[in-house]
């Protein structure tokens, strides 16, 4: 056990920076009422932003209308990847133009994505909630993922909203025709769903709103429940309920923070550990 006999607590006040809860007559020297071009300093307080430059000088191209939203931004293979309208584009950092690497993604929604390496080659998989999930290699050659063929799982992964790699399988969820179902590929092959080779499906009793791998488990967030999948393959995959009383209303809020998972529940931000004790 550590010797704490020479350790004494020290109390100090966190002062300075932006103060909005005091009258200007009560503010001390060094406290600010309004800050422009400042950001939090990693050493405490605030620091002035000395300047900035655009990562890519050109805007992501529109495909049909200027009102189209940018639906995804990520980095892969030393490039910036962005989705807007019906297309996916790439650009070099510091570049001034975008290159189309995939098109025809009709009615695409907000994307989820996963970087992975199952066969010694880095890949990026994206899912938009409407079209087939698409895999890119480092040359940005696109391959659509499909399931439901002979000898494969019957549930098609086209229209998946969520995609994540777990225990060498690729997991898909959020299909409009199977909102309560989780589909996983065979080991080390994101586009193979042969049931006799290790692919399969898992059903829960609520609509899935997000997936997150945390430590050795895959957490399945639903509207009113949270489940946990453990194991490594079809032979020992096991699903247990974390809670059947509270769910996640927005899968984009699921984040790892301070050794736990946080998410937005119906009553605000919650931790999985705290929710499991309810």
Feature locations, PLM:
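Beta-propeller fold detector
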Residues: 99-104, 143-149, 194-197, 237-243, ...
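Short coil/turn segments at the loop-to-beta-strand junctions that recur within blades
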Residues: 104-110, 149-158, 243-249
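N-terminal beta-propeller domains
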Residues: 1-98, 153-227
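Short loop/turn segments that connect beta-strands within beta-propeller blades
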Residues: 92-95, 137-140, 188, 231-234, ...
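Acidic glycine-/aspartate-rich tracts in secreted/extracellular proteins
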Residues: 131, 176-177, 233
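Asp-box/WD-like beta-propeller blade repeats and closely related beta-sheet repeat scaffolds
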Residues: 137-163
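Beta-sheet-dominated scaffold domains
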Residues: 8-16, 118, 169, 206-278
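Acidic, glycine/polar-enriched metal-coordinating patches/loops
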Residues: 93-131
